[in-house]
From Swiss-Prot:
Effect of I140F: In allele Sej; non-secretor phenotype
Broadest EC class assigned to this enzyme: transferase
Name listed for the protein in its UniProt record: Galactoside alpha-(1,2)-fucosyltransferase 2
Tissue and organ expression note: Small intestine, colon and lung.
Species, as recorded: Homo sapiens (Human)
Amino acid sequence: MLVVQMPFSFPMAHFILFVFTVSTIFHVQQRLAKIQAMWELPVQIPVLASTSKALGPSQLRGMWTINAIGRLGNQMGEYATLYALAKMNGRPAFIPAQMHSTLAPIFRITLPVLHSATASRIPWQNYHLNDWMEEEYRHIPGEYVRFTGYPCSWTFYHHLRQEILQEFTLHDHVREEAQKFLRGLQVNGSRPGTFVGVHVRRGDYVHVMPKVWKGVVADRRYLQQALDWFRARYSSLIFVVTSNGMAWCRENIDTSHGDVVFAGDGIEGSPAKDFALLTQCNHTIMTIGTFGIWAAYLTGGDTIYLANYTLPDSPFLKIFKPEAAFLPEWTGIAADLSPLLKH
């Protein structure tokens, strides 16, 4: 059957168009009102569950961070401590931008960065840490915790040693530069079979240790004993010396065996070269300070360190426990405290 379609009514078309237009305008206004309301809402920190230890890694609640103070060795200690304590307590860890700027050019660190603009809006609970692990640190309350202090002790993170070593893996170009230098070294015309990194901390410690902490820095006698310790145990070796007092080292380290090279540049503001050289060696001689401690920790092998370098009544021993700083398998050589006793 043929159906004849009537032409669309002109008034009806206008009516439908009017309804469509009004409906569209109303819908758009409602959407804009919702968007504006979202913009006007204050940024809030979400209310988080206190049972985060039972959650998976992707569900960790809260935010923990740590102060970024001191130079390279200090900030490595702060990073590793934050890494370990956050994992122990089931909280996500974030590092300050300043710490990232110090560590990221050298190491393949993985913790996310907390920028200062964000950090300033968080109601932090400051939590001071001693320089050694305490039982109470296994159960730290609070979702937004900022650690303070200078923690640098294997007692915090040694149970995660492989993970810490992974975090402090050198970038390829940093490692290769150090290895290229070491490959070019010779002892009496032949390539050495054993490399011993030597770090001599001087700088401000030369004055701070005796005047503030009733202590000493490494002297000529200690370094001679440390070098001889390795010479008695290894053949075909070379000592790779780095220091922030290289002129003193050149005058006080015996080079008559032909097995000592003064390699580091001693520039504290850019320590990557010296640190990389030390960690690419097989063994370590350190004096005092976190730079040497971390070099020895990452290197492995045998480590000789300066022991008993303060008087028994030193205030330094209230904030520093030698047994928490030096691994049990490391070998200490006692410092000569006689210069302190003369005053």
